């Protein structure tokens, strides 16, 4: 039953995010925030597919333990694409609120992203095994969490300052995604059921993409 639920949900998620991303790319002009957000959604969906597709195959066949290599490789790729996702989201923030300068902020975003990716590339992560070390799971997610916190603060203050109704909950979608993701990192190996928290975490990302898609439709409607 769990295999069916997860597989159906993952298919729905990937199709939804990729479809919305492509529609935003096609429905916006080059260099705009929505073109960037569309690219961000495609990166999100494409990156997650490297993990979710083998996971669905594993759940529906011989089990997760027999798919250590493809699952590990998928997690590895997803860890990098998720970092790129937040870098792109930072630039969405800059474009939406017409931010100029802020060189130190940009350096911080790139520094945290670089540290995160370097940590993800370390062999100590043992990505291609069934037992990845918890210590390295925590280490590689520290700069990722700091990057997420930075983006949360930026969107919260900017949306409030500009009274941006369309993006007023963007910060909350990121809070929820990290809130559901953290227990999975810490305790999923102890209690596999905790891994089910990835479903609401994924829903938070769908909400992130929907916020931008709905904002694009609203703005396009005003211009027509």
Residue spans for each PLM region:
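Hydrophobic transmembrane alpha-helical segments in integral membrane proteins
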Residues: 1-18
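A loop-to-helix transmembrane entry motif
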Residues: 6, 106-109, 130-148, 164-171, ...
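Alpha-helical transmembrane segments in multipass membrane proteins, preferentially the mid-helix core
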Residues: 16-26, 87-93, 118-124, 142-168, ...
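Internal transmembrane alpha-helix with an interfacial aromatic "cap," most often the third helix
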Residues: 19-25, 50-106, 120-122, 155, ...
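Membrane-interface helix-boundary motifs at transmembrane edges
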Residues: 25-37, 93-105, 130-133, 156-168, ...
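Alpha-helical transmembrane segments of multi-pass integral membrane proteins
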Residues: 39-53, 74-91, 103-124, 140-151, ...
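Terminal transmembrane helical module of multi-pass membrane proteins
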Residues: 171-217
């Amino acid at each position: 039953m769990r295999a069916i639920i997860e597989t159906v949900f993952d298919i729905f998620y990937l199709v939804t995010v990729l479809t919305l991303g492509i529609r935003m790319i096609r429905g916006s002009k080059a260099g705009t925030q929505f073109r960037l957000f569309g690219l961000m959604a495609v990166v999100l969906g494409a990156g997650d597919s490297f993990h979710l597709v083998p996971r669905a195959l594993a759940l529906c066949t011989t089990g997760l333990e027999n798919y250590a290599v493809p699952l590990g490789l998928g997690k590895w790729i997803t860890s990098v694409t998720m970092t790129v996702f937040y870098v792109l989201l930072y630039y969405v923030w800059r474009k939406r609120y017409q931010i100029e300068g802020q060189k130190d902020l940009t350096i911080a975003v790139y520094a945290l992203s670089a540290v995160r990716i370097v940590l993800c590339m370390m062999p100590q992560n043992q990505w291609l095994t069934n037992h990845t070390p918890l210590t390295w799971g925590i280490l590689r997610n520290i700069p990722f969490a700091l990057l997420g916190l930075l983006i949360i603060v930026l969107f919260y203050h900017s949306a409030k300052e500009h009274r941006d109704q369309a993006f007023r909950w963007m910060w909350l979608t990121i809070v929820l995604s990290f809130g559901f993701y953290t227990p999975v990192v810490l305790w999923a190996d102890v209690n596999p059921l905790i891994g089910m928290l990835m479903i609401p975490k994924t829903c938070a990302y769908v909400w992130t993409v929907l916020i931008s898609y709905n904002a694009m439709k609203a703005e396009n409607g005003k211009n027509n």
